[in-house]
């Protein structure tokens, strides 16, 4: 089994096509703590609204757009024409699947993990999938309410400090699990590159004999889309299966 290049995760995302409490169609605003994320737009028109210590910003999205952002940036996808489809590329595969995100619920819903999960409709393991479209919509709407409050606070000269502090308290207990996942997964790909460079320094070529091709096999079970934070998801598992050679021995 082999990780995707750079230890990333890939997800096909069809952004929700229902309006939020402010009338804008789109997904649930949230942020990540240890992973950068990129959006490669393959269809439709929309935007990503963001909040950071620099305030509010909106970036237009269309087919071919590529945008990315670092941990701490609160982001909300807007599906302007109802057709927005994206490949989401997530750093550090394994961490997002194990809870590296917090939705922008109003601060009173971030009091503790039990309170947060109750309103987020998440599994205890930290899954980002809801169990029904109604649950996903309710969660999205609550996150939008919190997002709008944070935006107003920033516009009035406030900061994100209180929200950030409470969000970190929610995810801090997961740090040791995330560290283990990172050390045994994405970080190991960096060490492997170092090993390759060490080989090149000495002029060795033997490691090239281990080159192989991998794929994520088509599996009907994997084609069943899940309800995520921003839309319906089709995940591509980060570990691919080797494609067996059919060549006759020479």
Per-segment meaning from a language model:
Residues 12-32:
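Conserved short histidine dyad/triad with adjacent acidic residue
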Residues 2-15:
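N-terminal regions that are enriched for targeting/export leaders
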Residues 181-250:
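C-terminal non-catalytic accessory extensions
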Residues 73-76:
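Short, charged beta-turn/beta-strand-edge "cap" motif at the junction between a beta-strand
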Residues 51-71:
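Short acidic-glycine-tyrosine-enriched beta hairpin
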Residues 81-157:
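Double-stranded beta-helix
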Residues 33-48, 90-91:
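Short, conserved beta-strand element in jelly-roll/cupin
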Residues 124-208:
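An accessory alpha-helical subdomain
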């Amino acid at each position: 089994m082999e990780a995707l290049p750079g230890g990333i995760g890939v997800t096909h995302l069809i952004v929700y096509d229902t309006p939020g409490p402010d009338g804008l169609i789109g997904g649930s605003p949230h942020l990540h703590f240890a992973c950068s994320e990129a959006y490669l737009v393959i269809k439709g028109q929309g935007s990503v609204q963001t909040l950071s210590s620099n305030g509010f910003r909106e970036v237009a999205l269309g087919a071919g757009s590529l945008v990315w952002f670092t941990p701490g940036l609160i982001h909300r996808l807007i599906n302007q024409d109802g057709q927005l489809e994206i490949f989401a590329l997530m750093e550090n595969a394994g961490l997002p699947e194990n809870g590296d995100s917090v939705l922008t619920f109003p601060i009173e819903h971030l009091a503790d993990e039990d309170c947060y999960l109750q309103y987020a409709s998440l599994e205890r393991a930290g899954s980002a999938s809801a169990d029904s479209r109604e649950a996903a919509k309710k969660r999205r709407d609550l996150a939008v309410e919190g997002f709008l409050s944070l935006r107003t606070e920033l516009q009035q000269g406030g900061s994100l400090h209180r929200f950030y502090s409470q969000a970190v308290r929610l995810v801090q207990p997961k740090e040791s699990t995330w560290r283990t996942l990172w050390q045994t997964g994405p970080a190991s790909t960096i060490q492997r590159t170092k090993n390759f460079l060490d080989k090149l320094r000495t002029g060795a070529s033997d490691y090239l004999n281990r080159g192989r091709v991998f794929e994520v096999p088509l599996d009907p079970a994997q084609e069943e889309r899940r309800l995520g934070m921003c839309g319906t998801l089709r995940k591509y598992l980060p570990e691919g299966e080797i494609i067996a050679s059919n060549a006759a021995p020479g």
